[in-house]
UniProtKB/Swiss-Prot annotation:
Cofactor(s) required, per the database record: Mg(2+)
Active site: D329 (proton acceptor)
GO BP: any one term: cellular response to cell envelope stress
SUPFAM superfamilies (UniProt xref): Nucleotide cyclase (SSF55073)
Organism in which the protein naturally occurs: Escherichia coli (strain K12)
Protein name: Diguanylate cyclase DgcN
Topological domains, Periplasmic: 46-52, 134-154
Length: 408
């Protein structure tokens, strides 16, 4: 049992397993979404940056047209520098029709730049943007631009940071909602397992699983409750059968009084109770003319007499004293709350008077039947055997004395 408990403690709970599954699913889903959105965003940004740089180059051609026509290098350089200071490109070249460099401008970095920025710049713009310069419909030169990576890298970092933040926020909301939605599942399963555990551990078949909102759990609850109904009914029948067997084992089937087995158990319990022994006594009672009744009117009449004897003993004892049938016409009674031997003698006299009343044989006849009574005080004996020996001895003495009186 201890090993089973330790094994259960090592196993994850349904709530924890469900939470782990949800966390794993959310993490994988959000990572895939993050990767998909990141790649899509960067590809879109690449197209946007290339078109923006091409648009810048196309705009510059109108400013450089006159300088190229007149081969005015300083004017072209001044134009490139003015536009380059705005941070839209890092290098610019103006070439004439013969591919001679007429003017150029380079952005001077204050730092060498990080690897990521260089990689982004090379990936977005693997080659300079080339835009022809036209005059009167004829190509007279070209301008070549290379984008500046700092602004692009910053924008990419910012976009990824915002995207990551949104993904984390969405993950947090998803986790919160998932836990809230899972509470119903966890509580439903916990309710079922609590009932099953209580039934198994405490044999409490009166427990029932409450109705559940989820169809499968509800169907299981109905089936399990039906099973519990059958088990409870079976347990009640078993308890009733056991009670009947116990009563049969401890009671006389004819008179309904407690039998010899119950007497032995009761007298041993009494002798082991030091307080009860001080105020108790044992009576043995035996019929004096029961054989005559059996021989004269038959055993059925004898049984009716025994039933009447048991009835009178039970009514006399009430809730205070306990009567037993030991077998045949032998009876016993344990007296409780008696303070002296004289009180016991008074009880014996009262019993004798009760049995002086005639018995109705239900066949048109009546008869009398006396009982010989012997008693023993429990306080005077250390064992149940000695107590019974004295009570039995005194009973037979009383029987002999009654027989002698009848002879005289």
């Amino acid at each position: 049992m201890m090993d089973n408990d330790n094994s259960l403690n090592k196993r994850p709970t349904f709530k924890r397993a469900l939470r782990n599954i949800s966390m794993t699913s959310i993490f994988i889903t959000m990572m895939l979404i993050w990767l998909l959105l990141s790649v899509t965003s960067v590809l879109t940004l690449k197209q946007y940056a290339q078109k923006n740089l091409a648009l810048t180059a196309a705009t510059m051609t109108y400013s450089l047209e006159a300088a190229v026509v007149f081969a005015d290098g300083p004017a072209a350089t001044e134009t490139l520098a003015a536009l380059g200071q705005q941070g839209q490109f890092s290098t610019a070249e103006v070439r004439d029709k013969q591919q001679n460099i007429l003017a150029s401008w380079h952005y001077t970095r204050k730092d060498p730049g990080d690897t990521f920025s260089n990689f982004i710049s090379h990936w977005l713009f693997p080659a300079p943007i080339i835009q022809p310069i036209r005059h009167n419909g004829e190509t007279i030169g070209e301008v070549r631009l290379t984008a500046r990576d700092s602004s692009i890298s910053h924008f990419i970092w910012f976009s990824l940071a915002v995207l990551t933040g949104c993904i984390l926020l969405a993950s947090g909301i998803a986790i919160t909602l998932t836990r809230h939605l899972h509470n119903g599942l966890v509580e439903a399963l916990k309710n079922i397992t609590d009932v099953v555990h209580d039934v198994r551990s405490n044999r409490n078949f009166s427990r029932r699983v409450s109705e559940e909102r989820i169809a499968e759990f509800h169907r299981f609850a109905l089936d399990f409750n039906s099973l519990l109904d059958e088990m409870e009914e079976w347990q009640l029948r078993l308890q009733a059968k056991n009670a009947q067997l116990l009563r049969t084992a401890l009671h006389d089937p004819l008179t309904g009084l407690a039998n010899r087995a119950a007497f032995r158990s009761g007298i041993n319990t009494l002798m082991n109770n030091s307080d009860a022994r001080k105020t108790s006594a044992l009576l043995f009672l035996d019929g004096d003319n029961f054989k005559y009744i059996n021989d004269t009117w038959g055993h059925a009449t004898g049984d009716r007499v025994l039933i009447e004897i048991a009835k009178r003993l039970a009514e006399f004892g009430g809730l205070r004293h306990k009567a037993y049938r030991l077998g045949g016409d032998e009876f016993a009674m344990v007296l409780y709350d008696v303070q002296s031997e004289s009180e016991v003698q008074q009880i014996c006299s009262a019993l004798t008077q009760i049995f002086n009343l005639p018995f109705d044989l239900h066949n048109g006849h009546q008869t009398t039947m006396t009982l010989s009574i012997g008693y023993a005080m429990t306080i005077e004996h250390a064992s149940a055997e000695k107590l019974q020996e004295l009570a039995d001895h005194n009973m037979y003495q009383a029987k002999h004395q009654r027989a002698e009186k009848l002879v005289r």
